[in-house]
Amino acid sequence: MIEINIYYRKWYNIINKPKSFIKKIINTSLIDLNIYEYKPTISVVLANNRLLQKLNYEYRKKNKPTNVLSFPYNKLNKYCYLGEIFVSLDTLINESTDLNIPIEHHTSHMLIHGLLHILDYNHEEPLEQYIMESIEIKLLDKLGIKNPYVPRET
């Protein structure tokens, strides 16, 4: 089950039907990762820089906003509460503008990135980063989104 909390109302102005959009991304990813049948509960909070900066400071001691924060709660098992993913619209807008990509594509990427973190993937070491990015690229491709790690013309 995907629980979606729209903390920052501006999401409605930027993403068409944000709840349906989020469910499509997460469910497509869970199916492709062969874990949909576990029926995990995942909470997604559509937030802003203010909340992400507060959480980033509280949990990571970094006093600045960020694009996505993930909080894993349980290892994957049937019907578990897997974790929470928080995304900041403000940061995603700035980054997608800088990258010259649609906000929907960048949001999809960050949601998948956050999902992989709550599934215990990380990018601390080069091999881990390669594995995580490869999975992101594959999942984004399923959604019709180009590889975000290939430099684009601006």
Curated annotation (Swiss-Prot):
Enzyme Commission number(s) of this protein? 3.1.-.-
Q: Which Pfam families match?
A: YbeY
Q: What does this protein do?
A: Single strand-specific metallo-endoribonuclease involved in late-stage 70S ribosome quality control and in maturation of the 3' terminus of the 16S rRNA.
Q: Per UniProt, what is one GO molecular function of this protein? A: RNA endonuclease activity
Stated name of the protein: Endoribonuclease YbeY
Q: Which SUPFAM superfamilies match?
A: Metalloproteases ('zincins'), catalytic domain
For this record, an example GO cellular component is: cytoplasm
HAMAP family, per database record: Endoribonucl_YbeY (MF_00009)
PANTHER family in alphabetical order: ENDORIBONUCLEASE YBEY, CHLOROPLASTIC
The family assignment reads: Belongs to the endoribonuclease YbeY family.
Kindly list the places in or outside the cell where this protein is found, as annotated in its UniProt entry.
Cytoplasm
Q: Where, by residue number, does Zn(2+) bind?
A: 113, 117, 123
Enzyme superclass (EC)? hydrolase
Q: Which GO terms describe its biological process?
A: rRNA processing
